[in-house]
């Protein structure tokens, strides 16, 4: 299965059969290389990936300044230390799950809820971890 298939079928999927979808999704290597992404996923800056990776190594690193994705600021909210970073911006937000080799990104807007985004992103992330990825 290609990485693009994971994004298309497992991240940009119909959530709970409700006809709702994430706004954007991506799978990115720890080095910042894009493995696959939805057409709507914003262009990440190298320093943003560096900051995200540092926050996984040193939880709380991004909290004072915020999480930036393509220059857009998200307020960092409760995640899972070293495993999941979550951010909020207005009625939407972002979930980032770290696997052994990749970062799984999901960006949502209403009517998708933070919990739905977390479920979709973390489910794929957990599967990739089980597969040694």
Swiss-Prot record:
One of its GO terms (cellular component) is cell cortex. CDD domains: PROF. Gene3D superfamilies: Dynein light chain 2a, cytoplasmic. InterPro entries: PFN (IPR048278), PFN_euk (IPR005455), PFN_sf (IPR036140), Profilin_CS (IPR027310). Keywords: Actin-binding, Allergen, Cytoplasm, Cytoskeleton. The keyword Cytoplasm applies. Its main location: cytoplasm. GO terms for molecular function: actin monomer binding. The keyword tRNA-binding does not apply. Coiled coil: none annotated. It is found in: Cytoplasm, Cytoskeleton. SMART domains: PROF. Belongs to the profilin family. Binds to actin and affects the structure of the cytoskeleton. At high concentrations, profilin prevents the polymerization of actin, whereas it enhances it at low concentrations. By binding to PIP2, it inhibits the formation of IP3 and DG. PANTHER family: PROFILIN, PROFILIN-5. Occurs in many kinds of cells as a complex with monomeric actin in a 1:1 ratio. This is Profilin.
